Swiss-Prot record:
Protein name, entry field: Photosystem I P700 chlorophyll a apoprotein A2
Binding residues annotated for chlorophyll a B3, in chain numbering: M662, Y670
MF (Gene Ontology): 4 iron, 4 sulfur cluster binding; chlorophyll binding; electron transfer activity; magnesium ion binding; oxidoreductase activity
Localization in the cell: Plastid, Chloroplast thylakoid membrane
Lineage: Eukaryota, Viridiplantae, Streptophyta, Embryophyta, Bryophyta
Length: 734
């Protein structure tokens, strides 16, 4: 018999039911579990797939550039960034009637278009691109790079070019290559681009390939560099009256330490950012020369880890055995990488709005909201993935013999204390926060708002004051005119910082009060509960008192039959599954908070947030209900407008979300019976029964149905909020 899908599993390919297809898809990327898989082939397949991933990323960015150059209004937007709406791409839709065509024809376009809320216009403008020709050039270049990576991926699967396992496990060489080669040199190259192209362009000087080698980025060229007078490069920065993109008010400095924002663009100074990238480059290039490879000098990772034992002997053997454990476990490495990337992505969300790096981004409110929300959701998914792979590590790769009494073993030994402390923190936060919200709700319902319990976040306000925010009157550190830090800041470093932090037109260190105090603790509840579920899932993945042999069952199992009773819902996968709901819940609160605080800030009615955010009805009525009105009016008795697409998406998102419950709340037997009844009917229906199936139809497994339910819940949840966010923000601010 010809081999059927999946080729990687002989057992599955012979399964006579539709389980073959579903389990085949589910395990397609679990290379470790495939037939005849060796360690060497595993590493090589993953390595080659990285090139495919990079090719897709470059193709995608190339597509962004291409569509904006072809169908966008980049040049017109550059002439007036505050009033022209940036176009992402044209819409060709045969269903559009005349009202729709008119509603979606905007941004100076001749036909229906989508508006860009991704911030790419601001980014490309900041880094010195000005014409459609520039965009096409970038697009073609990235297309070429994409093809190059596809070829590289194919090449590294050929016998002559396949790296050996020892090459993959050479930690020091990889560190050197990633630190110096990737981070260091790319940061240096980016500094070069900023200094040679972006900064001159921001001062009205057009540098392209034809004059790159003749246009001096600084009047004195490399003279000060070789003379050791580096401070010359910081002298004569752009003035506060500088008009971005022109020579009016422009200076000559290329590497500065001004702090604060460019008054016109409301973004960080380009010369500050060039300085930052140069510093990063220097640090990382040095860091990439620290590890021992060919010359027998430098650090050995194994020696560093073996040496890390706590003094006194009472805290175990520290990091002994960790090197081999990490170096031989791809899941451990992936878990660490995802945890780092998740934190970085969330930091990007926080910094994109508080310290906007791109010109005019701060004035494009819808883009600000979209970027914040996007990065927080991505961070949530990446972080939960980190714990999932941590749990898989404990099941598949952890060796108790190699890790006797080291930090990993001690985590497992202390798991009851860790889990119960997290549980206690979650309970404390949940009961107290909800108690305060509900108390305040009742007081408002009974017409006695003055009896609310309103707690000022004094510690957070003190921290803001220490960083220079004068509003609260704490008079401490940077907010005290007598402190040495304050005096040094006037001249030596970041003189623009104090102006920025005390300026109400940006989002740096927003003024906070009782509403912020409450929602902060609600978010803390969400974070601690999500962490509790994920940490418990990983620490109990190998076994628990209830099920000591859990690791023999693998990462995901539904139950172990009636014999042991009560072993359902305790696989590591189930913990991950439950945690995703809590993660989405938490990010919902985070994004609601951010968005509501900012729309009141942008509209100049911060009192609305301050007064309504202290009780639950305020959130439901004055944030969700009030801001969904434009959305629901995408269609109305008078026709339609440009928000109609978001009205559709809002409805569709609710539909997808609700569909998730069909999979989550009913169990497998119901579907199996239904399928058998439908199959019976099919076989007895004329004409229909001419169509037969090769695989006997069976219901999804419990775990698979949960995955399908979770996917619908997540996608619907995100679609619904995305439509709400973009429509409510763009409906107010255009």
């Amino acid at each position: 018999m010809a081999s059927r899908f999946p080729k990687f599993s002989r057992g599955l390919s012979q399964d006579p039911t539709t389980r073959r297809i579903w389990f085949g898809i589910a395990t397609a990327h679990d290379f470790e579990s495939h037939d005849d898989m060796t360690e060497e082939r595993l590493y090589q397949k993953i390595f080659a797939s990285h090139f495919g991933q990079l090719a897709i990323i470059f193709l995608w960015t190339s597509g962004n550039l291409f569509h904006v150059a072809w169908q966008g209004n980049f040049e017109a937007w550059g002439q007036d960034p505050l009033h022209v709406r940036p176009i992402a791409h044209a819409i060709w839709d045969p269903h559009f009637g005349q009202p729709a065509v008119e509603a979606f024809t905007r941004g100076g376009a001749s036909g229906p278009v989508n508006i860009a809320y991704s911030g790419v216009y601001q980014w490309w403008y900041t880094i010195g691109l000005r014409t459609n020709q520039d965009l096409y050039g970038g697009s073609i270049f990235l297309l070429f790079v994409s093809a190059l990576f596809l070829i590289a991926g194919w090449l590294h699967l050929q016998p002559k070019w396949k790296p050996s396992v020892s090459w993959f496990k050479n930690a020091e060489s990889r560190l050197n290559h990633h630190l110096s080669g990737l981070f260091g040199v790319s940061s240096l190259a980016w500094t070069g681009h900023l200094v040679h192209v972006a900064i001159p362009e921001s001062r009205g000087e057009h540098v392209r390939w034809n004059n790159l080698l003749t246009a001096l980025p600084h009047p004195q060229g490399l003279g000060p560099f070789f003379a050791g007078q580096w401070n010359v490069y910081a002298q004569n920065p752009d003035s506060n009256s500088h008009l971005f993109g022109t020579s009016e008010g422009a200076g000559t400095a290329i590497l500065t330490f001004l702090g604060g924002f460019h008054p016109q663009t409301q973004s960080l100074w380009l010369t500050d950012m060039a300085h930052h990238h140069l510093a990063i480059a220097v640090i990382f290039i040095i860091a990439g020369h620290m590890y021992r490879t060919n010359f027998g000098i430098g650090h050995s990772m194994k020696e560093i880890l073996e040496a890390h034992t706590p003094p006194g002997g009472r805290l175990g053997r520290g990091h002994k055995g960790l090197y081999d454990t990490i170096n031989n476990s791809l899941h451990f490495q992936l878990g660490l990488a995802l945890a780092s990337l998740g934190v970085i992505t969330s930091l990007v969300a926080q910094h994109m709005y508080s310290l906007p790096p791109y010109a005019f981004l701060a004035q494009d409110f819808t883009t600000q909201a979209a970027l914040y929300t996007h990065h927080q959701y991505i961070a949530g998914f990446i972080m939960t993935g980190a714990f999932a792979h941590g749990a898989i590590f404990f099941i598949r790769d952890y060796n108790p013999e190699q890790n006797k009494d080291n930090v990993l073993a001690r985590m497992l030994e202390h798991k009851e204390a860790i889990i119960s402390h997290l549980s206690w923190a979650s309970l404390f936060l949940g009961f107290h926060t909800l108690g305060l919200y509900v108390h305040n709700d009742v007081m408002l319902a009974f017409g006695t708002p003055e009896k609310q319990i309103l707690i000022e976040p004094v510690f957070a306000q003190w921290i803001q004051s220490a960083h220079g925010k004068a509003l609260y009157g704490f008079d401490v550190l940077l907010s005290s005119a007598d402190s040495p830090a304050f005096n040094a800041g006037q001249t030596l470093w970041l003189p623009g910082w104090l102006d920025a932090i005390n300026n109400n037109s940006n989002s740096l260190f927003l003024t906070i009060g009782p509403g912020d105090f409450l929602v902060h603790h609600a978010i803390a509840l969400g974070l601690h509960t999500t962490t509790l579920i994920l940490v418990k899932g990983a620490l109990d993945a190998r076994g628990s008192k209830l099920m000591p042999d859990k690791k023999e069952f693998g990462y995901s199992f539904p139950c172990d039959g009636p014999g042991r009773g009560g072993t359902c819902d305790i696989s590591a996968w189930d913990a991950f599954y439950l945690a995703v709901f809590w993660m989405l819940n938490t990010i919902g609160w985070v994004t609601f908070y951010w968005h509501w605080k900012h729309i009141t800030l942008w509209q100049g009615n911060v009192a609305q947030f301050n007064e309504s955010s202290t009780y639950l009805m305020g959130w439901l009525r004055d944030y969700l209900w009030l801001n969904s009105s434009q959305l629901i009016n995408g269609y109305n008795p008078f026709g339609m407008n440009s928000l109609s697409v978001w009205a559709w998406m809002f409805l569709f998102g609710h539909l997808v979300w609700a569909t998730g419950f069909m999979f989550l709340i009913s169990w497998r037997g119901y579907w199996q019976e239904l399928i058998e009844t439908l199959a019976w009917a099919h076989e007895r229906t004329p004409l229909a029964n001419l169509v037969r199936w090769k695989d006997k139809p069976v219901a999804l497994s419990i775990v698979q149905a949960r995955l399908v339910g979770l996917a619908h819940f997540s996608v619907g949840y995100i679609f619904t909020y995305a439509a709400f966010l973009i429509a409510s923000t763009s409906g107010k601010f255009g």
